[in-house]
């Protein structure tokens, strides 16, 4: 998965969610 841009939401990909969490860029509901 790729890092998400500021304000974007995760699509359910664990990689994207982890990146999202690590960078505190967006909310992620699915892990």
UniProtKB/Swiss-Prot annotation:
Cellular localization per UniProt: Secreted
Any one GO molecular-function label of the UniProt entry: toxin activity
CC annotations in GO: extracellular region
Coiled coil: none
Keyword annotations: Calcium channel impairing toxin, Disulfide bond, Ion channel impairing toxin, Neurotoxin, Secreted, Toxin, Voltage-gated calcium channel impairing toxin
InterPro entries referenced in this protein's UniProt entry, alphabetically: Toxin_34 (IPR013605)
Organs and tissues of expression: Expressed by the venom gland.
Modified how: Disulfide bonds are present.
Known role: Omega-agatoxins are antagonists of voltage-gated calcium channels (Cav).
Family statement: Belongs to the neurotoxin 04 (omega-agtx) family. 03 (type II/III omega-agtx) subfamily.
Name of the molecule in the record: U14-ctenitoxin-Co1a
Species per Swiss-Prot/TrEMBL record: Ctenus ornatus
Lineage: Eukaryota, Metazoa, Ecdysozoa, Arthropoda, Chelicerata
């Amino acid at each position: 998965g790729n890092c998400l841009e500021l304000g974007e939401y995760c699509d359910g990909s664990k990689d994207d969610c982890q990146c999202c969490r690590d960078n505190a860029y967006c909310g992620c509901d699915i892990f």
